[in-house]
């Protein structure tokens, strides 16, 4: 067996980065991920983003492809529509679809990110936290990352970024 394994360096271990790490690792890629924030499994999830995330069929399809749909949907809450409150005190439900087959689901963003991080590591991805991208030289295939805990620079080589 030769050295045919494709390598990818990802910057960002949020929802998209973690999901991509899972999908590529499952397909035999050697994936290394660098994330600016600390590990949310250690210090808790901190983000300025909304607490919950609305998950539609397209998102469920991506989770299904990664083998994560069942675990995530076990904690999801169905949302059939939005409630409109009139000035006169009336309330009207505006459904997202025709029936309960056309709904969106509410999931906790932090819990979803942690589940995806854990799955990415289980599939073989390596994740480095506290590494903020500073500079990239695509021609040389190098990048400089800064550790936010001590402002030290770390130079890496990458095949694909």
Report residues per predicted region.
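Glycine-rich NAD(P) Rossmann-fold beta1-alpha1 loop
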Residues: 14
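Conserved N-terminal helical subregion
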Residues: 2-7, 56-161
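Conserved phosphate-binding/catalytic loops and adjacent sensor/switch elements of nucleotide-binding enzymes
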Residues: 53
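Short, solvent-exposed beta-strand edge segments and adjacent coil->beta transition regions
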Residues: 48-50, 102
């Amino acid at each position: 067996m030769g050295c045919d394994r494709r390598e990818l360096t990802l910057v960002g271990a949020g929802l998209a980065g973690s999901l991509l790490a899972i999908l590529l690792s499952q397909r035999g890629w050697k994936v290394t991920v660098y994330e600016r924030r600390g590990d949310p499994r250690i210090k808790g999830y901190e983000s300025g983003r909304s607490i919950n995330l609305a998950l539609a069929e397209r998102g469920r399809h991506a989770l299904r492809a990664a083998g994560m749909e069942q675990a995530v949907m076990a904690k999801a809450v169905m949302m059939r529509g939005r409630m409109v409150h009139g000035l006169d005190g009336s309330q009207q439900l505006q459904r997202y679809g025709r029936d309960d087959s056309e709904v969106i689901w509410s999931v906790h963003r932090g819990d979803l990110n942690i589940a995806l991080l854990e799955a990415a590591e289980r599939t073989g991805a390596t994740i480095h936290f506290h590494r903020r991208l500073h500079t990239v030289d695509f021609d040389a295939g190098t990048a400089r990352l800064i550790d936010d805990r001590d402002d030290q620079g770390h130079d890496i080589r990458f095949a694909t970024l």
